[in-house]
Structures are given as C-alpha cells and as structure tokens.
Amino acid sequence: MSQPIYKRILLKLSGEALQGEDGLGIDPAILDRMAVEIKELVEMGVEVGVVLGGGNLFRGAKLAKAGMNRVVGDHMGMLATVMNGLAMRDSLFRADVNAKLMSAFQLNGICDTYNWSEAIKMLREKRVVIFSAGTGNPFFTTDSTACLRGIEIEADVVLKATKVDGVYDCDPAKNPDAKLYKNLTYAEVIDKELKVMDLSAFTLARDHGMPIRVFNMGKPGALRQVVTGTEEGTTIC
C-alpha cells in the first residue's frame, strides 16, 4: 500500500455529499462508504479531522432570502451540521473507528464543546475528530470552518470533497468541454474567479499558507489517492 504524504488532514464534506438520489436527508449507504474510506486513512496512520456541512438538511441563506432573519437561519444551519456529525460519528463507530464529535457551542449530553487542546490530544491518539456547529457564529460558512479548524489543528492540508473531479474553468455540468485544473496558485484562483469556496474561507487559507485539495468524494478510493499523493483532483497552494 502507498504511504500517505500527509500526517494530519482536515476533510471538508458538504451536506449534499451525504444525501442520496432523492436529494434530501442522509443516505446511510453513502455515509457508511465514507466511514470506511476514513477508516483506511486512520489505519495508514493519518490523523483525521472532519467538518460537515448541513445543506442536505437546512439552508439558512436560502430562507433568509425568503424573509427569515439570517442569524436565526444560520443557527438552524449550525444545528443541521450537528445532526450530520452525529450520523457520521455513529457510522464511524459501526466501522470500529474511534471518533469524537465536538460542537462550537454547548450541547450537553449530545457532544463535547470544541476545545483546541483536547482536539489536538485526540488526533494524536488517532481518534477521528468531527467539528460541528460551524464556527459558532452566523454569517460564516462551513468552508470557513474547515479552513479555521484546519489552521488551528495545524493540518497539513484541507481536503474539500465535492461532486466533481476538481476545479474547472467553468461548470462541467453545463459545459462538457470544461477544463480541469491539476494545480493552481491562490492568486490564479482569485484572478480567474474560480468557484473553490467562499472568499472569506479562501483568503483565510491563503493568508496562513494552508494548501487546499479539491476532489470527487463520489469516486471510490479517491480520498485514499489524494492522501497518498496521486494527482487526483486539484491542488491549490
């Protein structure tokens, strides 16, 4: 088996990546496959932190446009990420992976409150740490959470799992001739206005020199290939 090129990673999974063909909720089969792929990394000695989105259950920004207070909507979205985190933790447990769920705010009896030093300790013990509830503040996306937590835990890279094979020059769903980039600099992403993640999250990663790799989590084995250094997906640094 190929050796990993990263010691510690932060894996960002969108809520949409967890939903099945009906486009809503959580598909247990997808969740279990992701848990098995994460288990492979743990068995290779990689320390894994995970940030989950909540878009499969709730989108605060969308309802804000319909008149809901944005702060209320974002709080509901944060709780959706906790629900996804609970599902992921359960799936990892069933795969015999030791995992800990942390929330950015207190949810006594459900999960631990985020604590930086405790998270580092658990990662060193080869426990998967799932970070939920975003940053704990409204107006920040889970992409921002992924970059923030990645920087805090001193991850080697943020791995952004998507439904496409990486970063393209245009939408591959609309243009079959879309070009896939293998390597990009932070400046190229901004200059070309490529949709990698929201600007706040991206500039946070850039300012702290945090590499980002974008890949297709729907492709079996892609996560392992990214971690072992193949040219899977797009690398931004």
Swiss-Prot record:
InterPro entries from the UniProt entry? AceGlu_kinase-like_sf (IPR036393), Asp/Glu/Uridylate_kinase (IPR001048), Uridylate_kinase (IPR011817), Uridylate_kinase_bac (IPR015963)
Where found?
Answer: Cytoplasm
Pathway assigned to this chain's UniProt record: Pyrimidine metabolism; CTP biosynthesis via de novo pathway; UDP from UMP (UMPK route): step 1/1
Q: Keyword Cytoplasm on this protein?
A: yes
Q: Which GO terms describe its biological process?
A: 'de novo' CTP biosynthetic process; UDP biosynthetic process
Q: Name one Pfam family in it.
A: AA_kinase
For this protein, what reaction is catalysed? UMP + ATP = UDP + ADP
Q: Which domain of life is it from?
A: Bacteria
Q: Which residues are UMP-binding?
A: 54, 74, 135-142
Gene3D superfamilies assigned = Acetylglutamate kinase-like (3.40.1160.10)
Keywords recorded for this protein, A-Z: Allosteric enzyme, ATP-binding, Cytoplasm, Kinase, Nucleotide-binding, Pyrimidine biosynthesis, Transferase
- Show the segment(s) annotated as Involved in allosteric activation by GTP: 20-25
Query: What EC number(s) would the UniProt record show?
Result: 2.7.4.22
Q: What does this protein do?
A: Catalyzes the reversible phosphorylation of UMP to UDP.
Q: What is this protein called?
A: Uridylate kinase
